[in-house]
Amino acid sequence: MAELLTLARPYAKAAFAYASEQGATDNWSNALQVLSAAVQDEAFSAYLNRPELTPAEQVKSFAKVLGEDQSQAVSNFLTLLADNDRLVLLPEIAAEYEQLKSQNNNNVDVVIESAFPLTAEQEQLLKSALEKRFNSTVTVSVEVKPELIAGVVIRAGDQVIDDSALNKLEKMRTRLLA
């Protein structure tokens, strides 16, 4: 996963830089989401991975998926990905692009994993604290993960704040076995 993200990051940065320059970040965002979904579709992915398909034919397949939404710039981007055998990275490129877009809009997407469902008040308190910490607007999504036992794990981009009982038990175990 980390390797795919490492490969996808330069493509996402280039796409975002171009889209920002052209004032078309939302159009690119929509196109990348559609392309990402197409690549994740098993039937379409199997069709794309046929050895007899040339990169140009792969790009034509995406043109059918996007229809009128495909600009020349998106077509050129797809050609670059196809020529370098990187079409499989589209989901990671789309995710990284969205993260860059959020950063540019001074917005941070945060995932809070909790052992138990959070009340609206708890969620609001966490959101306020995170907005102060990141000095940005925060968009929160909450996931319930009982395996954490207690506490929360907060993920914002590549930052992780792990205050779960599971993590504390693992640290204790490591110290005792050392």
Curated annotation (Swiss-Prot):
UniProt entry keywords in alphabetical sequence: ATP synthesis, Cell inner membrane, Cell membrane, CF(1), Hydrogen ion transport, Ion transport, Membrane, Transport
GO molecular function annotation: proton-transporting ATP synthase activity, rotational mechanism
Highest taxon listed in the record's lineage: Bacteria
Primary site of residence: membrane
GO cellular component entries: plasma membrane; proton-transporting ATP synthase complex
Signal sequence annotation: none
UniProt family annotation: Belongs to the ATPase delta chain family.
Protein name as catalogued: ATP synthase subunit delta
Lineage of origin: Bacteria, Pseudomonadati, Pseudomonadota, Gammaproteobacteria, Moraxellales
